């Protein structure tokens, strides 16, 4: 039986108090943006839930697929709407039951939001259950483990009936928690960190450090693709690509080999701080995981963080690597992240990097050269791309154009 509405249940935003309206409006805006390319949809946001009406032109399954990726949504149900007339409600439930197979079981769950409705909850359950039993054969009631749970919600504007629930992404609507700058390396961890922070309602812009010719265009393409995957959930994301070769070569000239990783990370943060101020972000996000590599011990983090007063958010800091890999697979970034193209964090890696850097030595090595101008130059020569879910590089566009000419 074809449905004509989608019921969207809110996630954590239901815990908000006087500012709930702000969160509901932000979620509504995000839903409208996500569905704008699909014909036949109309979004109506209310305080406790959202309804999306569908016409025959709407691709209902595609609408559901997009909604499940939007942060702030707990779940989605395809629903059928009718009036508060008892006969109409019975007819709708009986029509739904025609999809039940012989031997299957059901139960009726009634939620009577409109307390002015003349029948109480249990009486309505009995009426509807009886109507289904009378109109079908070899179908029975099981209130504990039914094959179908027929949910009926009686509201002021009508009665909604449904049997399916699709799990949403949860979290808070993106845009309600400010903006951060995600340090996107191209590995497994940083895209997951970006997804986790977006789930808290935070909008991201991404920054990537590119060191040609030591890092290839394939490494850059990989980061673009990771950004594209992240954008599927939130819309267009700006990716800032930093020319990092000059800085990285100079670090390797003047800093002791065991300390080059520490200094590299410090210079990255210095550049990121400049970009953060330009774009109006409030924090830096990275995929660091405590103890995973030499630069991610507590002493290393302390030495690296010294160059900035900006808050640094580490959503993955306490997770096991297996948990991070699992999340990467779930969000669709894992297969891209493991492509064998080196980024600037893996080139020039010392054989024996220091895990507990002496802070005084870090300062001593870096004082041999004034990095200020080089840091500013890197920040001034950034390439900024706006990536959405349909993004194609100039190379891909040229390829498409060539194919069109040939065929």
Swiss-Prot record:
Catalysis: reaction(s): [ThiI sulfur-carrier protein]-S-sulfanyl-L-cysteine + a uridine in tRNA + 2 reduced [2Fe-2S]-[ferredoxin] + ATP + H(+) = [ThiI sulfur-carrier protein]-L-cysteine + a 4-thiouridine in tRNA + 2 oxidized [2Fe-2S]-[ferredoxin] + AMP + diphosphate; [ThiS sulfur-carrier protein]-C-terminal Gly-Gly-AMP + S-sulfanyl-L-cysteinyl-[cysteine desulfurase] + AH2 = [ThiS sulfur-carrier protein]-C-terminal-Gly-aminoethanethioate + L-cysteinyl-[cysteine desulfurase] + A + AMP + 2 H(+)
Gene Ontology CC annotation, any one: cytosol
InterPro entries (UniProt xref): Rossmann-like_a/b/a_fold (IPR014729), ThiI_AANH (IPR020536), ThiI_fer (IPR054173), ThiI_N (IPR049961), THUMP_dom (IPR004114), THUMP_ThiI (IPR049962), tRNA_STrfase (IPR003720), tRNA_sulfurtransferase_ThiI (IPR050102)
Stretches assigned to the THUMP domain: 61-165
Entry keyword set: ATP-binding, Cytoplasm, Nucleotide-binding, RNA-binding, Thiamine biosynthesis, Transferase, tRNA-binding
Subcellular location, record wording: Cytoplasm
Biological-process GO terms, alphabetical: thiamine biosynthetic process; thiamine diphosphate biosynthetic process; thiazole biosynthetic process; tRNA 4-thiouridine biosynthesis
Pathway: Cofactor biosynthesis; thiamine diphosphate biosynthesis
SUPFAM superfamilies in the record: Adenine nucleotide alpha hydrolases-like (SSF52402), THUMP domain-like (SSF143437)
Principal location: cytoplasm
Disulfide bonds: none
TM annotation in the entry: none
The protein's Enzyme Commission number: 2.8.1.4
Protein residues bound to ATP: 183-184, 208-209, 265, 287, 296
Presence of the UniProt keyword Nucleotide-binding in the record: yes
Molecular function in Gene Ontology: ATP binding; CCA tRNA nucleotidyltransferase activity; tRNA binding; tRNA-uracil-4 sulfurtransferase activity
Function: Catalyzes the ATP-dependent transfer of a sulfur to tRNA to produce 4-thiouridine in position 8 of tRNAs, which functions as a near-UV photosensor. Also catalyzes the transfer of sulfur to the sulfur carrier protein ThiS, forming ThiS-thiocarboxylate. This is a step in the synthesis of thiazole, in the thiamine biosynthesis pathway. The sulfur is donated as persulfide by IscS.
Matching HAMAP family: ThiI
Similarity annotation: Belongs to the ThiI family.
The name this protein goes by in its record: Probable tRNA sulfurtransferase
Source species of the chain: Staphylococcus haemolyticus (strain JCSC1435)
Lineage: Bacteria, Bacillati, Bacillota, Bacilli, Bacillales
């Amino acid at each position: 039986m074809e449905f004509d509405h989608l019921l969207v249940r809110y996630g954590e935003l239901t815990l908000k108090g006087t500012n709930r309206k702000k969160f509901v409006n932000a979620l509504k805006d995000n839903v409208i943006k996500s569905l704008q390319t699909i014909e036949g949809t109309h979004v109506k946001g209310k305080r406790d839930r959202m309804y999306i009406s569908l016409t025959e032109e709407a691709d209902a399954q595609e609408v559901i697929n997009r909604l499940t990726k939007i942060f702030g949504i707990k779940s989605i149900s395809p629903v059928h709407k009718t009036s508060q007339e008892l006969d109409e409600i019975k007819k709708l439930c009986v029509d739904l039951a025609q999809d039940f197979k012989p031997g299957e079981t059901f139960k009726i769950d009634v939620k009577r939001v409109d307390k002015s409705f003349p029948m109480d909850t249990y009486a309505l359950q009995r009426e509807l259950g009886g109507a289904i039993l009378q109109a079908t054969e070899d179908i029975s009631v099981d209130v504990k483990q039914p094959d179908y749970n027929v949910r009926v919600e009686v509201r002021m504007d009508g009665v909604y009936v449904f049997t399916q629930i699709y799990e949403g992404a949860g979290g808070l609507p993106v845009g309600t928690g400010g903006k951060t700058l995600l340090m996107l390396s191209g590995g497994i961890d940083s895209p997951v960190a970006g997804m986790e922070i977006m789930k808290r309602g935070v909008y991201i812009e991404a920054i990537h450090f590119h060191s040609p010719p030591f890092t290839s265009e394939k490494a850059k393409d990989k980061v673009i693709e990771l950004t594209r995957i992240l954008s599927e959930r939130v819309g267009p994301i700006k990716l800032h690509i930093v020319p990092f070769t000059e800085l990285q070569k100079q670090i390797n000239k003047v800093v002791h080999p065991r300390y080059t990783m520490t200094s590299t990370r410090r210079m990255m943060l210095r550049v990121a701080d400049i970009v953060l101020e330009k774009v109006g972000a409030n924090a830096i996000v990275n995929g660091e995981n405590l103890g995973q590599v030499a630069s991610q011990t507590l002493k290393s983090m302390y030495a690296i963080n010294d160059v900035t007063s900006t808050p640094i958010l580490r959503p993955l800091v306490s997770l096991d690597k297996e948990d991070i890999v699992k999340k990467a697979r779930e969000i669709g970034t894992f297969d891209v992240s493991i492509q064998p193209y080196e980024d600037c964090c893996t080139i020039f890696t010392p054989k024996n990097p220091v895990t507990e850097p002496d802070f005084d030595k870090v300062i001593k090595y870096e004082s041999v050269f004034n990095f200020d101008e080089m840091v500013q130059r890197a920040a001034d020569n950034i390439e900024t791309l706006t990536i959405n879910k349909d993004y194609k590089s100039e190379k891909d566009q040229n390829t498409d154009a060539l194919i069109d000419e040939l065929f």
